[in-house]
Amino acid sequence: MLARDALNALYTFGGVFAGTALGWPVFLAGVFGVVSAISATLVSWIGGRADRHWGPKPVIVACALALTAVCVLITGLGRQQIFGLPVAPGSHLPDALFFLCGVLIGGAGGAMQAASRTMMVRHTTPARATEAFGLYALSGKATAFLAPWLIARATQATGNQSLGVFPLIVMFLLALVLLSWVQSKGEAQQ
């Protein structure tokens, strides 16, 4: 739930961040979305092959770590500076880095969602699949407010939209901690 909420917040607030913190026009935010979608297609395919070879848990871990790295990069990204280091006026470095973030958000997000569903299949039986996937869908809705609320509180507390992403780092890391107790092969097959 935590990783899904954080990922959904990245999807939702990516364009908002680009428009407000980086000053992107709507057109460029649209290009960002297309780039993210294309990377989601390619990396999800690669993630599916990795899932088949190593199982879903390592894919989920790798994707959550990549998304955590994206959040860390966003916390230090701005039009005039990157992690406190000044950026030359007119530099496209912040834009290029945020496009890289979009590639990683789309790619790692798509692969993580697919691997999460594979993990669900491993943790249910055919007789309980509808119930398990129904609870999985409900859990995503039950806490959907959490990440946006935390982003709003962090942004308000720091006065910095980039630092407002910090709670997502915590959410991804907590998800990884909780994932350590999940059995890779699934309970249904043991």
Regions found by a protein language model. Name each.
Residues 90-93, 153-172:
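A membrane-interface helix-boundary motif in multi-pass transporters
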